[in-house]
Amino acid sequence: MYTNNAYLNNSTIDRKDKSKPLVITMCGTYKLYTRPKLPTWRPRGRLDFQLLYIAAGKAHFHFDNNDEATIVHAGHMVLYRPKEPQKYEYYAKDQTEVYWVHFTGNNVTNLLRSYGLTNKKVFHCGSGAEYQNLFCSMIKELQMCQDGYEEMLEIYLRQIFIRLQRHFKSSLNSDNSHAFEEIDNAISYFCEHYNEPINIDAVSYT
């Protein structure tokens, strides 16, 4: 198993920090090769937020203390909020690659809402190197702790949020475009066959 993790002040302690609007406390990545299983079980959740990005393979999540797993495939993100139970597993057979970040702050809920991250737990975000690059940049910043690293961490995480927001809007526009195209096709059909008996089922397949 490959791991590359970073922690604010080298501390793995769960924390809630209300001193700033957004604070990144830890981030990292896991890639399973030979280790059969990597489970996580936090019955009481955590005090902070956690965002996970499934970059490859898939992961098994148990939401709302459900024994039955929800399979989350590559190209999706999972968002845990404070005190939400966290139970999930990665399996080597799934060739799972995941990136994660924990964050807190005094304005996180409003910030997430402004980017379209509502009360859903699983978000489709698409695949590509952009997300991996941003997570890797956060890991490096938190490991090196150079001047201004806390601000850089916030900038990288906000870029992830912005990319998610753009993906949500482009997906919505795509769905709307498809719907408008179907409406146009139906109107054309009615105009061409106005003097004939109309079969609604036939129209739906034109």
Regions found by a protein language model. Name each.
Residues 83-107:
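Ligand-binding loop in jelly-roll beta-barrel domains
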